[in-house]
Amino acid sequence: MTEFQIKEDGRSMIPSVFSHAGKKELVLLQYPQLQALDMVKHCFTTRMGGVSKNEFSSLDLSFNRGDDIEAVKENFRRVAEAMEVPAGQIVCSDQTHTTNVRKVTAEDAGSGLTKERPYHDVDGLITDVPGLMLATFYADCVPLYFVDTKHRAIGLSHSGWRGTVNRMGRATLKAMAEAYGTVPEDVWCAIGPSICQDCYEVSEDVALEFEQEFSGHGSEI
């Protein structure tokens, strides 16, 4: 899971390991460049530091894979504690491989965690509300982080192969531009951990879609 939050007071990157020690030790990944902005809190969770058992061990953050619901809630509480944010301020995506982006407001706090989501089919979240924590979820897909330092707004998007070929990054920036006046020159971007090209095989049909959409970059596909 990836989480992202604007601090209350507040382009090539390699994540570093952040450990939240104590009885609830977590191993999280963070980007030093985003931390240095002193505007956002963020992390990419690993499987370590939770309470889930067996095939869900241990930091399972999914409510729909058959894990014990209370264990998942405790895992969320541990991440929230490490990020120093109430769990009720987390806002979760509803990922279905779209390029839909939701403007998150204070009324959305807790959506997908402490209350039902008032939205569906949302793979990108944006906000300029301090204190809200955006959360998206990953297996082998790509997390995209956006920080508009001028307008103090953030975006967090899930981009699988379908989202990538449909330009999820562009859709997120467009949504931020419409909502906050964001322009690319003011935005720091980061690409989170995902599967590598050596481990991800696609069908000929999928490869053809990429060739057609990114015809000017054929040698890189």
Where are these regions (language model features)?
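Active-site microenvironment for binding and transforming phosphate-containing groups
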Residues: 1-221
